[in-house]
Amino acid sequence: MHPTRSFQGLILTLHNYWAEHGCAILQPYDMEVGAGTFHPATTLRSLGPKPWKAAYVQPSRRPKDGRYGENPNRLQHYYQYQVIIKPSPPNLQDLYLGSLRAIGLDPTLHDVRFVEDDWESPTLGAWGLGWECWCDGMEVSQFTYFQQVCGIECSPVSGELTYGLERLAMYVQGVDNVYDLNFNGLEGDEKVTYGEVFLQAEQEYSRYNFEMANTEALRQHFIDAERECEAILKAGAPGPNANHQMHKSVFPAYDQCIKASHVFNLMDARGVISVTERQSYILRVRNLARQCGEAFLLTDAGGFNFKREGE
């Protein structure tokens, strides 16, 4: 399935490319997240000393970006392709350029530039040194070396690549409207477009995000998720005298952190959060993320008993 002829072909090509370079090809996380970085395969696995290589597609929701399906390239629900490699290899940029060749963008035939743009996620307490990758004047992906996640220093540093799949597909297919993208690579009566798959949902979720979401219920949902996250972390924490006992309930707690973040984004879209409240909500989500990150380091996956080479 050719990557320049269909949305699904683009995804399959990236899967094959990164699988050939040693990445575990994971599935999307089954939660409402604002970006692929929220997937625990990135947020949590970027912490601790254990090596990690993974790639996956992640449906992402940003309620404020909805335009009722009337904007040709702005969506409240879209797809990111995420690659996370720890420790970051010295040839990460070359690997990335190789992925562009795989999907039909030869860097020698196009104006490919890396524009410095350090990345930050306030709710995750994360930041990294980064670059946007521009191809012929259009941003197609983000290239980041994580320095801190969940307020915790990353050691070793992870390399992260994020492709905006719709934008990339529009570029390689040569279309100006996301809804005109060929989704399945067929033509005639069998052709399925991006609009046939997603336009109605985009219209309906825009109405929900901006007009219908129950704001009082959302405020309570945030409180509930916050309390549940902290209760789960407390229940799974090692006892005070158990120096070698690991944490037992990080992932369920992190799910509640993700829920709190999405509820915050919905309230923001509904316009019911003041400037001062906004900062308070961000700090509350960041606090949950920090607690989850600290707990993850007390697990096997987080490297609690891991010994690096030479130790």
Curated annotation (Swiss-Prot):
One Pfam family hit: tRNA-synt_2e
SUPFAM superfamilies listed in its UniProt record: Class II aaRS and biotin synthetases
InterPro entries linked: aa-tRNA-synth_II/BPL/LPL, Gly-tRNA-synth_heterodimer, Gly-tRNA_ligase_asu
GO biological process: one example: glycyl-tRNA aminoacylation
Superkingdom of the source species: Bacteria
Transmembrane segments: none
GO molecular function: ATP binding; glycine-tRNA ligase activity
Keywords: Aminoacyl-tRNA synthetase, ATP-binding, Cytoplasm, Ligase, Nucleotide-binding, Protein biosynthesis
Disulfide-bonded cysteines: none
Primary location recorded for the protein, binned into one broad class: cytoplasm
EC number from the UniProt entry: 6.1.1.14
GO cellular component, one term: cytosol
Localization: Cytoplasm
Reactions that this protein is recorded to catalyse: tRNA(Gly) + glycine + ATP = glycyl-tRNA(Gly) + AMP + diphosphate
Matches recorded under NCBIfam families: glyQ, PRK09348.1
Subunit-structure text: Tetramer of two alpha and two beta subunits.
Family of this protein: Belongs to the class-II aminoacyl-tRNA synthetase family.
Protein name (record): Glycine--tRNA ligase alpha subunit
Lineage of source species: Bacteria, Pseudomonadati, Pseudomonadota, Alphaproteobacteria, Hyphomicrobiales
